[in-house]
């Protein structure tokens, strides 16, 4: 497993903290963010992630940059599945749009912390026991089968929200921006707080798929975490952009299933079959592109009827 110089980690940490500060500053206040502004920020986040690939290329070489791009594309593609979950959580709890931004901010920052824990633990396990890679492969193949069979767009209620609501007293006011309130002398969690918990728990479940998928293209801890971080940072803006029609992307889950299956087969057969990072990038782009194009075609066709 390749060791990354400490100064590169320090540079990444400095850039990451700076980007988080910019994100918080640019979205401060309780105003509802326009779709056009969110499109701008989505493009900006993607451009930043790609610019970091150029930095990696200049410091660590082309092969490392290709691995970073492959891991970034995997995380970015699979995060589209997260959008379905975000939408269902907010619909279940009836969270207004201005509060959704707050929930997404907490959810994304929490995801950065949890992903770090999972990635470092996974890297340590792979380094110590070679057979862990095959477990990752099996997990990905089963996840692909599940993604193929179950369309998240058809889910009407969040199971995570239902589970939390049976264990915590919840207030009914979904417009409240506080996390807890007192009602008749009893402390209750607000729907906003429950939505944040649901987002965090959902991301933990998604990490079980996405992190092993990243290990299928690289085992360098720095490349996995940096690619995950840059892919995650733009999720809030991306959600605002596509929330209105994400539920209509009927073939998207087949693309997710194909990506998971590809990653699972790649990591399982890595001892006998070598697939370069740049080929992985091409495969992922084609799979997600085909699924998106098919979904948009079906959406346009149904609209013309």
Describe every region a protein language model picked out.
Residues 1-305:
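Multi-pass alpha-helical transmembrane bundle typical of ion/small-solute transporters
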